[in-house]
From Swiss-Prot:
One of its GO terms (molecular function) is quinone binding. This is NAD(P)H-quinone oxidoreductase subunit J, chloroplastic. NDH is composed of at least 16 different subunits, 5 of which are encoded in the nucleus. Belongs to the complex I 30 kDa subunit family. It is a peripheral membrane protein. Its EC number is 7.1.1.-. NDH shuttles electrons from NAD(P)H:plastoquinone, via FMN and iron-sulfur (Fe-S) centers, to quinones in the photosynthetic chain and possibly in a chloroplast respiratory chain. The immediate electron acceptor for the enzyme in this species is believed to be plastoquinone. Couples the redox reaction to proton translocation, and thus conserves the redox energy in a proton gradient. The lineage of its organism: Eukaryota, Viridiplantae, Streptophyta, Embryophyta, Tracheophyta.
Length: 159
């Protein structure tokens, strides 16, 4: 599989990762181990990836793992030619823990909270990791493939 310049740079510096190829826009996707994510995130920030475009999470497969996905941007040669990379960090469902990157990219705040709320990934060292969309009393993680929808009845306004 063809590797991009970032993957080659990480190999040169003996940083453990796996290239997952390129998307339709030519953006390389890298898989990083959860235990290595905080140090690799610092490396990427120092190297110029100072903008977290988006972060999301998804359930890979029933009984499988969960993924936290980060889209990072580096603007080196002008705003018309940004360099982007996609990082996927996987965690097991039985103990889904990933280091938070809030302290590197502040825009991760609400995005990691939403991923926690919907998928159940705990982001270590996040300053305000609590539900953001669902009530605090909600049980379960609504976007997991094994989620069972609770029985509830809609209360309608009489007007």
């Amino acid at each position: 599989m063809q590797q991009g310049w970032l993957s080659n740079w990480l190999v040169k510096h003996e940083v453990v990762h796996r290239s997952l190829g390129f998307d339709h826009r030519g953006i390389e996707t890298l898989q990083i181990k959860a235990g290595d994510w905080d140090s690799i995130a610092v490396i990427l920030y120092v190297y110029g990836y100072n903008y977290l475009r988006s972060q999301c999470a998804y359930d890979v497969a029933p009984g499988g793992s969960l993924a936290s996905v980060y889209h990072l941007t580096r603007i080196q040669y002008g705003i018309d030619n940004p360099e982007e990379v996609c990082i996927k960090v996987f965690a097991q469902k039985d103990n889904p823990r990933i280091p938070s990157v809030f302290w590197i990219w502040r825009s991760a705040d609400f995005q990691e909270r939403e991923s926690y709320d919907m998928v159940g990934i705990s982001y270590d060292n996040h300053p305000r990791l609590k539900r953001i969309l669902m009530p605090e009393s909600w049980i379960g993680w609504p976007l997991r493939k094994d989620y069972i929808t609770p029985n509830f009845y809609e209360i309608q306004d009489a007007h």
